[in-house]
Amino acid sequence: HFNHCVAVVKLSDGTMMPLDPTWVPFCRELWSSAEQQQNYLPGTPEGTDLCITPISAPENHYVRIQANNVLDDKGTLKGSFTIEAEGQSDSNIRRIFTTGFQSEWKNALERQLLNVSPKARLEGVDYGRSPKDYQRAPIRMTFRYEIPDYALKSDQGVLIFKPFVLNNL
């Protein structure tokens, strides 16, 4: 098993907190929670026992989606949704901004909407002033869109559709 160097900080309560600059670029965490429950041995002058990296609770990695949509009688869905995320969820969503060219941001976001429907049209997206600035705050984006034929009308006149969040978004 390859291991690399990390820094360890001793907190005021005596616990050790590992810091790993190689795993957390563009991540809001000081220690990547993708590296949970791993053993490590801090090199301190007084010596220490084998430690284990902490578990990060799910609420530290939330994804929240709030939608405001209107489905017309022709089956066209119009509206917006705001997505907010923190922790590893933030890192995964923010990757569009931190690893891609700025000229491709809109196309990358539109591809996410096209996962819902190939007929989707991204009318606009607000990702704030500096979505690359992962240290400022959790990621928050608002999409505005229209999806023609999102719902199909049955012979009885009932609109049938698959819930938006079940469409790989």
PLM features per residue range, with description:
Residues 1-169:
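A sensor for short, sequence-defined functional sites
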